[in-house]
From Swiss-Prot:
EC number of the protein: 6.3.2.4
Entry's Gene Ontology BP terms: cell wall organization; peptidoglycan biosynthetic process; regulation of cell shape
Requisite cofactors: Mg(2+); Mn(2+)
Cofactor, how bound (note): Binds 2 magnesium or manganese ions per subunit.
Cellular compartment(s): Cytoplasm
The protein's name: D-alanine--D-alanine ligase
């Protein structure tokens, strides 16, 4: 690794319905990484999956980074320890690049689910975030909930279905013990494709919507009214795992729940409270449970754990291993409330990536 600035490549965009959220998250991370400490390269992933050099079309003033439609394509070399080629399609020889750390700012399938993490493992380069197993386990809400249930952690009752194995409204309602249901894609975040249903007609429409985004969908009991409480978890370079201050999301009555529109298109879609006003004993239980969830799903580096709280009842809702870093995102806000501003948070994430990669390289690969 260079003795000067640490070479960091920010990977953003991606083949996911959360492509635009990734672009906004990446813009904030780009601004938060100290240019005096890090040499930054921007790599956008197009909707069709091409990795494209994006430095020329972006700067630190962008609200959301741009993924260029064309430009030099980036090829990360297997076992290259961060070496890459920029290929511009001309007869000229490819330009050689090198990175110490990859920062994947990717949300949803083909980015947060272990696929990109697998490519980075094969490239033998340090990277921010969970590894393949933790990323994949947390991404699939069905698998995650089963692992959490087996670990003795409280979850909301649910069933799953696919287009090939449909479930009727009556059977789903009977299975989870409620006529009011949430239907959601199993492998997507940012509330994309989620619906609240109260009868068979709404349920059928909700299933069709969710199946547009995923081959497997989750059907959960609606336990409203609840408070939506979140906790950020961070693993430091030495392996210590810490939980942040808590945050609360209060969706506007006009939305009914924290939908995609409430998050990203309606400025008044929800009120965000950091720190959340929670009884100290309940807050302590939530923070402890967040670190237990982190361990049960084999998470590393960072995660945001979302809870439903009703009185003294606490349920794990879901886990995001690459949480949003937009200007409204809770993960950086909760750490800031805990005394860790975003630039320092970036330093912690990069330091963990480098330390983990060094530890992994010490493991024997031959007998």
């Amino acid at each position: 690794m260079t003795s000067e600035r640490i070479r960091v490549a920010i990977l953003f965009g991606g083949r996911s319905a959360e492509h635009d959220v990734s672009r906004a998250s990446a813009a904030n991370i780009f601004r938060s990484l100290d240019a005096g400490r890090y040499a930054l390269t921007l790599i956008g992933i197009t909707h069709d999956g091409r990795w494209v050099l994006a430095d020329a079309v972006n700067d630190a003033t962008s609200a959301a980074l741009i993924v260029p439609a064309d430009g030099p394509q980036i090829v990360l070399l297997p076992a290259g320890r961060g070496r890459a080629l920029a290929i511009d399609g001309s007869a000229a020889a490819p330009r050689e690049l090198a990175f110490d750390v990859i920062f994947p700012v990717l949300h949803g399938p083909n980015g947060e689910d272990g696929t990109v993490q697998g490519a980075l493992e094969l490239a033998d380069v340090a990277y921010v975030g969970g590894r393949v197993l933790g990323s994949a386990a947390a991404m699939d809400k069905d698998v995650a909930k089963r692992l959490l249930r087996d670990a003795g952690l409280p979850i909301v009752p649910f069933v799953t279905m696919t287009a090939a194995s449909p479930v009727s409204y009556d059977d789903a309602a009977r299975a989870v013990g409620s006529s009011e249901l949430f239907v959601k894609p199993a492998n997507l975040g940012s509330s994309v494709g989620i619906s609240k249903t109260r009868d068979a007609a709404e349920f059928e429409a909700a299933c069709q919507l969710a199946l547009r985004f995923d081959r497997k969908i989750l059907i959960e009991r609606c336990i409203a009214p609840v408070r939506e409480i979140e906790c950020a978890v961070l693993e430091h370079a030495d392996g210590q795992i810490k939980a942040s201050e808590l945050g609360e999301i209060v969706p506007a009555n006009s939305h009914g729940f924290y939908s995609y529109e409430a998050k990203y298109t309606d400025a008044n879609g929800a009120a965000l409270h950091v720190p959340a006003q929670v009884e100290p004993a309940v807050a302590q239980r939530i923070r402890k449970m967040a670190t237990e969830v982190f361990g049960a799903l084999c998470c590393e580096s960072l995660a945001r754990v979302d809870f439903f709280v009703r009185g003294d009842e606490i349920y794990v809702n879901e886990v995001n291993t690459l949480p949003g870093f937009t200007n409204i995102s809770m993960y950086p806000k909760m750490w800031e409330a805990a005394g860790l501003p975003q630039p320092a948070l970036m330093d912690e994430l990069v330091a963990h990536a480098l330390a983990r990669h060094a530890r992994l390289r010490e493991l024997a690969s031959q007998r």
